Regions:
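One-carbon transfer enzymes
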Residues: 1-277
Length: 277
């Protein structure tokens, strides 16, 4: 189940043969088209802001302001990249649904007889959807949920002065990002300019790492070599305040400059000073 078809396609191409050799079949791919966002952007933005306000226990205007500022700030200087089409294998049924929380999504999973579901870059499932699916649901979270739950990815680690994020595959439960942990792996934060560029670069590289982590967890579950880890959930975070956004921007640029300076110094050391002939 995914809202990022390219990620699902990458996962299948990379791991289909190995999973089959381990006795694991991919029953279907359910793609969330998020039709509400496409048909009414204003209602979509308000809906996201309401969820953020509820989680952060803040006012709707405040949540809406943080949402707009974060989107504009994180996308500043972003270059539009061509989106390549993704060919999902014809042998694997694929379904396009208005939302992963729709009846169509649940019916598609049940019709294919799936024993478990994986959320690849998907949105939050509602309590009723979790109950109706009625089986193990695995989700990928770009942080250690003992440190922080919620969003945005990478941001809170940057603000904490970290050099890595801890990618996590955990069970989906009603409480956000609080289900038992099935696998984790460190991913380096790629400081490369401001906070927006840093998040994008880190998450782009994390897609491959998370894909491999999902596959390893599925293989381990099938072989019964993976033991779920219960934990005390960390705090839930939402979109940051403007002051936090400014602080993260400064931290990213300082670290990016330090990395560039270090690389240049290393290059000069390796090459050595030019010698007169």
């Amino acid at each position: 189940m995914t809202s990022q078809e390219a990620w699902a396609g990458s996962f299948i191409r990379r791991w289909l043969s190995r999973l089959r050799s381990e006795g694991i079949e991919i029953g279907c791919v359910v793609v969330d088209e998020n039709r509400t966002r496409r048909t009414n952007l204003v209602n979509h933005v308000l809906s996201v802001a309401k969820r953020q306000a509820k989680v952060a226990r803040s006012s709707l205007p405040g949540a809406l302001l943080r949402l707009v500022v974060f989107r504009l700030w994180s996308n500043f200087g972003r270059r539009d990249e061509a989106v390549t089409g993704t060919d999902l294998p014809e042998a694997i049924p694929s379904f396009r649904v208005p939302s992963l929380n729709s009846a169509e999504a649940v019916d598609a999973v049940h019709a294919c007889g799936c024993d478990a579901s994986c959320l690849l870059g998907a949105r939050i499932l509602t309590k009723s959807t979790i109950q109706e699916l009625g089986h193990l649901i695995l989700n990928g979270h770009a942080s250690d949920p003992r440190f922080v739950r919620g969003r945005p990815p990478v941001f809170w680690e940057v603000l904490n002065g970290d050099w890595h994020v801890c990618l996590t595959v955990h069970q989906v439960v009603q409480k956000l990002d609080a289900g038992p942990i099935y696998g984790q792996r460190l991913q380096e934060i790629l400081y490369c300019g401001g906070i927006g560029a840093t998040i994008r670069a880190t998450m782009q590289q994390a897609l491959v790492t998370m894909t491999d982590l999902f596959a390893e967890v599925l293989i381990g579950l099938h072989a019964r070599t993976v033991t779920p880890i219960e934990f005390n959930p960390g705090p839930v975070r939402t979109l940051p305040r403007i002051s936090q956004l400014i602080h993260a921007e400064i931290l990213c640029r300082r670290r990016s400059k330090r990395i560039r300076t270090g690389s240049q110094s290393a290059g000069q050391f390796l090459l050595g000073p030019s010698q007169p002939r």
